[in-house]
Amino acid sequence: MIEADRIISGQAKVDEDVIDRAIRPKLLADYVGQPQVREQMDIFIKAAKLRQDALDHLLIFGPPGLGKTTLANIVANEMGVNIRTTSGPVLEKAGDLAAMLTNLEPHDVLFIDEIHRLSPAIEEVLYPAMEDYQLDIMIGEGPAARSIKLDLPPFTLVGATTRAGSLTSPLRDRFGIVQRLEFYSVEDLTSIVARSAGCLNLELEQQAAFEVARRSRGTPRIANRLLRRVRDYADVRNGGIISINVAKQALSMLDVDDAGFDYLDRKLLSAVIERFDGGPVGLDNLAAAIGEERDTIEDVLEPYLIQQGFLQRTPRGRIATSQTYRHFGLQKLSD
């Protein structure tokens, strides 16, 4: 099973973009959660508008599904400018980036998702553009080739990444504002679910919103995805009304448990407990035991389990915590 196949994946799915745009907040006033980020961005945006400057270049990082793209669009809306969107893997040639930069209007936002995947050649074009609002272009080939400089309008580059550590230092250092998005509280996710239900004209009980939120792994994208699937269940089984019981039944059908775990999460934790006596167990042994690639365990499964205190990573291997035993209704044996 790959990450994109899981209903509790933080990665975006191809068919979700249209619906996500419909329920996505447009302004900071509608943006739920991330209070420190929201307060800081409110100050930075208002200051830039008072000075009639472009906002400083902004790097947003954090796990998938926490609202990096949403925040980039909010920045453009609050500044009253256009946003042009691309991604690191799409920008294969320097000319692709040059074309986007030369079409920007003053103070526009250029949003590059997965910015850690930019090639070195593209980064070289970005450096003078970010620092001096200039574009260095090579004209001609061979001995006759020469470099010319084009002036660019002041603009804001917003970069988004799930892997801030993979950015080169020269690129990272050129961002004047760096914001990290954290996992959301259940209370904030409940508000997000209720807001999304309103946008979709759903009849949703408050307790049902909480039930969806607490199984959403701290991630708005997962909360909204689960809400849509619960809506499907309610339309067929309960005349479209999403009660607490309907929400629980739908989520049970989807195999998402009270902790937001799916089959793969439970398979990993069960293997650590049952096959390796709670650990420590090495990554290769664990991968072989559950039939998954070690990269899948490290990049997809472990981060949330570790963050929530269900799995501990030690020099000797992975260990199931007391919380894991309680989740499965088991008693942890004393050392």
UniProtKB/Swiss-Prot annotation:
Coiled-coil intervals, chain numbering: none
InterPro entries in the record: AAA+_ATPase, AAA_lid_4, DNA_helicase_Holl-junc_RuvB, P-loop_NTPase, RuvB-like_N, RuvB_C, WH-like_DNA-bd_sf, WH_DNA-bd_sf
Region (Large ATPase domain (RuvB-L)): 4-184
Gene Ontology BP annotations: DNA recombination; DNA repair
EC number: 3.6.4.-
Keyword tags: ATP-binding, Cytoplasm, DNA damage, DNA recombination, DNA repair, DNA-binding, Hydrolase, Nucleotide-binding
Binding site for DNA: R294, R313, R318
Reaction(s) catalysed by this chain's protein: ATP + H2O = ADP + phosphate + H(+)
Main location: cytoplasm
Pfam families: AAA_lid_4, RuvB_C, RuvB_N
GO cellular component, one term: cytoplasm
Compartments where located: Cytoplasm
Binding site for Mg(2+): T69
Assembly and binders: Homohexamer. Forms an RuvA(8)-RuvB(12)-Holliday junction (HJ) complex. HJ DNA is sandwiched between 2 RuvA tetramers; dsDNA enters through RuvA and exits via RuvB. An RuvB hexamer assembles on each DNA strand where it exits the tetramer. Each RuvB hexamer is contacted by two RuvA subunits (via domain III) on 2 adjacent RuvB subunits; this complex drives branch migration. In the full resolvosome a probable DNA-RuvA(4)-RuvB(12)-RuvC(2) complex forms which resolves the HJ.
Role noted for this protein: The RuvA-RuvB-RuvC complex processes Holliday junction (HJ) DNA during genetic recombination and DNA repair, while the RuvA-RuvB complex plays an important role in the rescue of blocked DNA replication forks via replication fork reversal (RFR). RuvA specifically binds to HJ cruciform DNA, conferring on it an open structure. The RuvB hexamer acts as an ATP-dependent pump, pulling dsDNA into and through the RuvAB complex. RuvB forms 2 homohexamers on either side of HJ DNA bound by 1 or 2 RuvA tetramers; 4 subunits per hexamer contact DNA at a time.
HAMAP family in the record: DNA_HJ_migration_RuvB
Family: Belongs to the RuvB family.
Entry protein name: Holliday junction branch migration complex subunit RuvB
Organism field: Haemophilus influenzae (strain ATCC 51907 / DSM 11121 / KW20 / Rd)
